[in-house]
Amino acid sequence: CPCGRRRCCVRGLNVYCCF
């Protein structure tokens, strides 16, 4: 994932950057 230093979180079918 293009999250930079943040890790990638997966929730169901959504993939996003962890806050």
Swiss-Prot record:
> Might you name a Gene Ontology BP term for this protein?
defense response to bacterium
Q: Which cysteines does the record link by disulfide bonds? A: C1-C18, C3-C9, C8-C17
The reply on keyword Transit peptide is no
**Where, per UniProt, does this protein localize?**
Secreted
**Which keywords does the record carry?**
Antibiotic, Antimicrobial, Defensin, Disulfide bond, Secreted
Q: What is its main location?
A: secreted
Q: Spell out the GO cellular component terms annotated for this protein, sorted alphabetically and separated by semicolons.
A: extracellular region
Asked if Disulfide bond is a keyword of the record, the answer is: yes
What function is annotated for this protein? May have microbicidal activities. May inhibit corticotropin (ACTH) stimulated steroidogenesis and the microbial actions of the corticostatins.
Q: Which family does it belong to?
A: Belongs to the alpha-defensin family.
Its name, as the record gives it, is Corticostatin-related peptide LCRP
